[in-house]
Amino acid sequence: MSSNKIVLSSSDGESFEVEEAVARKLKIVEHMIEDDCVVTEVPLQNVTGKILSIVVEYCKKHVVDEESDEFKTWDEEFMKKFDQPTVFQLLLAANYLNIKGLLDLSAQTVADRIKDKTPEEIREIFNIENDFTPEEEAAVRKENAWAFE
């Protein structure tokens, strides 16, 4: 494993110096390294410093690809620290940076948080306006009564 350092720079100018092995967890960076496009610094224009610091923490923990109960427990506790807007930003960053494990974890966290919520509660979480008339909503509920049981 290489001990080279790479600086990851966020959209708001924060820099994070990490081991190459950690940087390679970001597949977008790994492809740059493999294509000899990375010298020492990688600008990540779609990720803020706040979110990049969380991504770096996750990648440092997961630098060794290992599936175990310890990782699962750590992942669950890790995600509990973040509010919904932060989880959404992590989801977007994980997608942009191509970090499958973090993408899956973020998506599962969102799914777990909306599980057993009413449509109104889900609309509030996602800031979605209800554009159904009361009549249309009643028709949809009647048509899909099994889903509301």
Curated annotation (Swiss-Prot):
Listed GO biological process terms: auxin-activated signaling pathway; jasmonic acid mediated signaling pathway; protein ubiquitination; response to auxin; response to jasmonic acid; ubiquitin-dependent protein catabolic process
Superkingdom of origin organism: Eukaryota
Stretches for region Interaction with the F-box domain of F-box proteins: 91-149
Compartments it resides in: Nucleus
CDD domains: BTB_POZ_SKP1
UniProt pathway annotation: Protein modification; protein ubiquitination
One Pfam family in the UniProt entry: Skp1_POZ
PANTHER family assigned: SKP1
Quaternary context: Part of a SCF (SKP1-cullin-F-box) protein ligase complex. Interacts with CPR1/CPR30, At3g61590, At4g39550 and At5g49610.
Family stated for the protein in its record: Belongs to the SKP1 family.
Name recorded for this polypeptide: SKP1-like protein 14
